[in-house]
Amino acid sequence: RTGEAAGISGIIMSKDSADIYNPKVIRSTMGSIFRVPFAIVDDLAAAVDTLKDNGITTYAAHLKGELYNSGSLTKDCALLIGNEARGLSEEISAKADKLIKIPMHGKVESLNAAIATAILMYEAAR
């Protein structure tokens, strides 16, 4: 539902992502799952290649990236976000046009995926 609120045009998920048909997941989307197009793909690397082939700039959230606000996220972009436990695979990270990160203070190493995604989606929507 945060994606819908931020104005995203769709979601691409790998087949090993959370089960979007789980009743708790459906309820948590407050109906957004029925309004925002999504695709579940067998080959995420191929999906990233297809995005890039169609002129979509890809940004991967990565601890080794540049600060997300040091440049401009373009309107036609895709945000690549890893899961809570492992982050993005090196294969997917390497395919990104740019690695980006959110600045951290204190001893915190990372934000949870939902919060990080929300920050980046709203930056892309500016």
Question: Whereabouts are the PLM-identified features?
Answer:
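Active-site/ligand-binding-proximal alpha/beta "capping" segment
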Residues: Y59-K107, N112
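Short flexible/disordered coil segments
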Residues: D53, T74-N83, I119-R126
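Structured adenosyl-cofactor binding patch, chiefly the S-adenosyl-L-methionine
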Residues: T2-A6, I20-I33, E90-R126
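RNA substrate-binding interface of SAM-dependent RNA methyltransferases
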Residues: R1-K64
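Generic hydrophobic alpha-helical scaffold/packing signal
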Residues: A39, A45-V48, K52, G65, ...
